[in-house]
UniProtKB/Swiss-Prot annotation:
Name of the featured protein: 3-alpha-mycarosylerythronolide B desosaminyl transferase
Protein role: Catalyzes the conversion of alpha-L-mycarosylerythronolide B into erythromycin D in the erythromycin biosynthesis pathway.
Pathway: Antibiotic biosynthesis; erythromycin biosynthesis
Gene3D superfamilies: Glycogen Phosphorylase B
Keywords: Antibiotic biosynthesis, Glycosyltransferase, Signal, Transferase
Statement: the UniProt record of this protein carries the keyword Acetylation: no
Reaction it catalyzes: 3-O-alpha-L-mycarosylerythronolide B + dTDP-alpha-D-desosamine = erythromycin D + dTDP + H(+)
Disulfide bonds: none
Gene: eryCIII
Length: 421
């Protein structure tokens, strides 16, 4: 088969696609990764073939264009909310109205859609696999009649939000049945001569989910579970990591997609100070810019600009992070208890469900204090229940089909959806 993978302009989102792309290639299929030019180097560094299309979407410019009010609004959304009193029509319509022109349309600009459609028309793939914020991919798949699937990187919050929205849509007066996402996708499909809009363009014809069942949201969609395989980009294991730690080790990271100088109201210096008297070796993945102005680094803290998480976390007794997909999945697949500092989007759902499963502690950022962080780290280190919960989660993830097995499942599903050419 010819298989297209596509990601928004973020290396952390791209990295989630890489292991399955490798598996398709190893099974003898032709693979192309179609994305904006900014990802070309990261794609080729992963040993994959890049097809740069469109113009770059600068995430800093995106944030500036969206504005702080929009960013703050999106961060404030509680995707774990189930109370009908909160999930009103006005609330759900507001979400669709804000997300469609910002996070959805801006991440798939016209140049990217045009490039995706043009490439798929010429190369004629048999399958398109896309991450959930790259709508250019399902648009191109629909226009060319190609089977397509989403590969998730976290709880399927956008589908849950849309299902809640669609559930209330028929109850509205006909003249007020607005659907911003369907409207954008409808006229975009028409522009390229595609079929009528269908919800498959939003959710894929099937979904591939690398998270354990305990973390997934029940959306009722056809879902293929997949064992998570960690990929952190090209990396070298530092010499000090070859040695067994002399005492318990804790990883402290805010991820690679966002190099912030604080989380909520807590600065990097306060984070480091909070873990300074924890009886453990702290490996803090902060670069020089993040450490600028930090006057005191505790004696038990080693700061490193980058270290491959798949090499570091198996040596750790716990990890503290922002709830991002790479940090979370890598810790989970290695059975490491987690202290999660969720700061918006899907991180709150991921943190809440991890705590409910017994594999860690969730500390919502707005209420975060250094004292809370210190005590939470001590709890996950000293309470065997957290280690047991993390081990159960690891076992659940290891029981999922490997990427190689998922290739076979996708072959069968694609064969059943392929249109005559």
């Amino acid at each position: 088969m010819r298989v297209v993978f596509s990601s928004m302009a973020s290396k952390s989102h791209l990295f989630g696609l890489v292991p399955l792309a490798w598996a398709f290639r190893a099974a003898g299929h032709e693979v192309r990764v179609v994305a904006s030019p900014a990802l070309t180097e990261d794609i080729t560094a992963a040993g994959l073939t890049a097809v740069p299309v469109g113009t770059d979407v600068d995430l800093v410019d995106f944030m500036t264009h969206a504005g702080h009010d929009i960013i703050d609004y999106v961060r404030s959304l509680d995707f774990s909310e189930r109370d009908p009193a909160t999930l009103t029509w006005e609330h759900l319509l507001g979400m669709q109205t804000v997300l469609t022109p910002t996070f959805y349309a801006l991440m798939s600009p016209d140049t990217l859609i045009e490039g995706m459609v043009s490439f798929c028309r010429k190369w004629r793939p048999d399958l398109v696999i896309w991450e959930p914020l790259t709508f250019a991919a399902p648009i191109a798949a629909a226009v060319t009649g190609t089977p397509h699937a989403r590969l998730l990187w976290g709880p399927d919050i956008t589908t849950r939000a849309r299902q809640n929205f669609l559930g209330l849509l028929p109850d509205q007066p006909e003249e007020h049945r607005e659907d911003p996402l369907a409207e954008w996708l409808t006229w975009t499909l028409e522009k390229y001569g595609g079929p009528a809009f269908d919800e498959e363009v939003v959710v894929g014809q099937w979904t591939i989910d690398p998270a354990p069942a305990a973390i997934r949201l029940d959306t009722g969609l056809k879902t293929v579970g997949m064992r998570y395989v960690d990929y952190n980009g090209p990396s070298v294991v530092p010499e000090w990591l070859h040695d067994e730690p002399e005492r318990r080790r804790v990883c402290l990271t805010l991820g690679i997609s966002s190099r912030e100088n604080s989380i909520g109201q807590v600065s990097i210096e306060e984070l480091l100070g909070a873990v300074g008297d924890v009886d453990a070796e702290i490996i803090a993945t902060f670069d020089a810019q993040q450490l600028e102005g930090v006057a005191n680094i505790p004696d038990n803290v080693r700061t490193v600009g980058f270290v491959p998480m798949h090499a570091l976390l198996p040596t750790c007794a716990a990890t503290v992070h922002h709830g991002g997909p790479g940090s979370w999945h890598t810790a989970a697949i290695h059975g490491v208890p987690q202290v999660i500092l969720p700061d918006g989007w899907d991180t709150g759902v991921r943190a809440q469900r991890t705590q409910e499963f017994g594999a860690g502690i969730a500390l919502p950022v707005p209420e975060l204090t250094p004292d809370q962080l210190r005590e939470s780290v001590k709890r996950v280190l000293d309470d065997p229940a957290h280690r047991a919960g993390a081990a159960r989660m690891r076992d659940d993830m290891l029981a999922e089909p490997s990427p190689a097995e998922v290739v076979g499942i996708c072959e069968e599903l694609a064969a059943g959806r392929r249109e005559p050419r």
